[in-house]
Amino acid sequence: MTSMDIPYSQISSFVNSSFFQKVSQLKLNKYRLDDTDKAIVGSVDFKFIGKNQPTSLSVDESSFNDNITYTHAQFPVKGILKNLNTVEDFRKVDKNEFLQSQGLVVHKSIQDRSCLKDLSKLTQFFILSFSDLKGFKFIYWFGFPSLVSRWKVNKLSGLTESQIEPYESKLNEWLNARLPIEQKQAFIIDNLEFKPFEQLSSFSPDDQLNIGFIDTSSILNKCSTQLRNILYMLAYYGFENIKVYNFRFNNTTSFTLDITLAEPLTSEPKTTGWERTAQGKLGPKLADIGALVDPARLADQSVDLNLKLMKWRVMPELDLDIIKNSKVLLLGAGTLGSYVSRVLLGYGVRHITFVDNGKVSFSNPVRQPLFNFTDCLEGGAPKAETAAKALKLIFPLITSQGYNLEVPMAGHPVTDEKRQYEDYQRLVTLIKEHDVVFLLMDSRETRWLPTVLCNVFDKICITAALGFDSYLVMRHGNLFNTEHIEAEENSHRLGCYFCNDIIAPKDSTTDRTLDQMCTVTRPGVALLASSLAAELFVSILQHPLKSHAPASLHDNATVLGCLPQQLRGFLHNFETSKLEANNYEYCSACSIQVLNEYKSRTWDFVKDALNENNYLEDLTGLTKVKQESEIAEKKFQEFENGLEFSDEDSEWIN
């Protein structure tokens, strides 16, 4: 076989689906709109290759790592990824110009001789791609830039076992030598001694140069195209007569090539190397990995996608991780609980717990989107558990549980202490285990104990309450020092839901009429209040002080804007007011007296608040405040009527 061009087998690519998943992750979290070249690395196997197979370059999720451990049967191949932002950008790229530019990178390493120390500069690859992250589709095109040099094959000879035997031990020594792996695929052979190309200057271009090449192809009598740039390099350095020992470790015959440079190199190097499709045509490939990936993982990535787009396109400072990692407790799984949980899902929250002691009724599904008609049958399914199951159907990776328990209510006497104490203990445990608590119940007194506990355990607490055409959304102020409550500066913390009241919570549910038992409210009010409550929670997390953040109407309070304490909305005139109220020193839920009493007596304190109507008012001083206000009112009336009053009572009107 004489006077012929060198027979080459082209390189084929193999892309593990994990590579595309890694691209998606990096695109969202790191690269964003940056479409500059990104360094990657692939690998080629030279031992475990099937029969009659071309060189196969593999990439996977590890291709982006700086330090990769390779087996003794692999060579690393350096490359770049150019991932474009739109499919139009991909189409507009001048493919020939791009290929030539990559060839010039190889050519430069030959000009400056850096390739002699790092042969991987001669075997580089690139990927031009576009990632459709919503559709989980990837358009990509591999290229293996090969500089063109024309060589004439004078002789191609297979190596018999006896001919290759003298080289076997040398090959094993070479592969195990303490050299960078990038140096080992090709080498100089000098009297059966293998030498790195760093020593090329010791050899004269006038003599025939013997080189060894460890082939990564198994096609009979064809060299891997990885040899192309090595031969171009030698031609550039003036070597025109070369004998190539093509060594194979894959049960196919090794062979030698005696070659001579057929044409001088052109002044402008020409580059080939775009990968062809399975049909032998030039063109990109399409990978649709949606069917290959766990659907739950696809859902996870899709949820993150919208949030990450919001972050790096609009608000880079937004801390999504703190939102995602927050554990949220929803006290109430009805209308407000349903809508709040859906907004939280949209924000990427992964841990939501429901507490409710009700069952799904036939009036619920139309207003409460976590329930459907079948949940109303057979007496109704438990709301909390059903809501948790519904969230898992919407997003399987959510951690969600429902607890069917009754929150102990101030003014509602203890009737079954064992059960109510268990409910109390469970509530305390749940509040301790979570980062934020939403009070979404439909009665005033059910909010009392959670308000106390959130202050004692320093938890973010948000209340949402509805009227017919109005709503209240507010965040509770917390103690700055829960260990030493007596040292607390009350004037510097925000108030809670009960701070505007001059009476303690009492039983408001007994003997209610039908219109009082049902939530009578315009249907849209719940959506407004729920969305504002969830958004307020997200804004709180963006403030460094979290639950201790002061109320601020300035747009720069957080990266999301202002951070109010209260939002009161009215649908009759479509207005929303931002209000602020500091802690009330006689508050029945967050005053120093109440918090100290709870810390010292816990359940016994709660029992007294449940059993005795006036206990909280006496404890906090509200009883005295009411008495004093009644005396003051009486004295003012007497004054207005022109009646005399004693000097000792004058303090009430001065």
Curated annotation (Swiss-Prot):
A GO biological-process term: piecemeal microautophagy of the nucleus
Intracellular or extracellular location(s): Cytoplasm; Preautophagosomal structure
Source organism superkingdom: Eukaryota
UniProt-listed CDD domains: Apg7 (cd01486)
Molecular functions (GO terms): Atg12 activating enzyme activity; Atg8 activating enzyme activity
Keywords tagged on the record: Autophagy, Cytoplasm, Protein transport, Transport, Ubl conjugation pathway
Motif GXGXXG motif, residue numbers: 332-337
Residue span of region Homodimerization: 615-654
Cysteine pairings via disulfide bonds: none
One GO location term (cellular component): phagophore assembly site
Keyword Protein transport included in the entry's annotation: yes
Active site: 518
UniProt remark on domains: The C-terminal 40 residues are required for homodimerization. The GxGxxG motif is important for the function, possibly through binding with ATP.
Subunit structure: Homodimer. Interacts with ATG8 through a thioester bond between Cys-518 and the C-terminal 'Gly-116' of ATG8.
Family: Belongs to the ATG7 family.
Protein purpose: E1-like activating enzyme involved in the 2 ubiquitin-like systems required for cytoplasm to vacuole transport (Cvt) and autophagy. Activates ATG12 for its conjugation with ATG5 and ATG8 for its conjugation with phosphatidylethanolamine. Both systems are needed for the ATG8 association to Cvt vesicles and autophagosomes membranes. Autophagy is essential for maintenance of amino acid levels and protein synthesis under nitrogen starvation.
Name of the protein: Ubiquitin-like modifier-activating enzyme ATG7
Organism the protein comes from: Komagataella pastoris (Yeast)
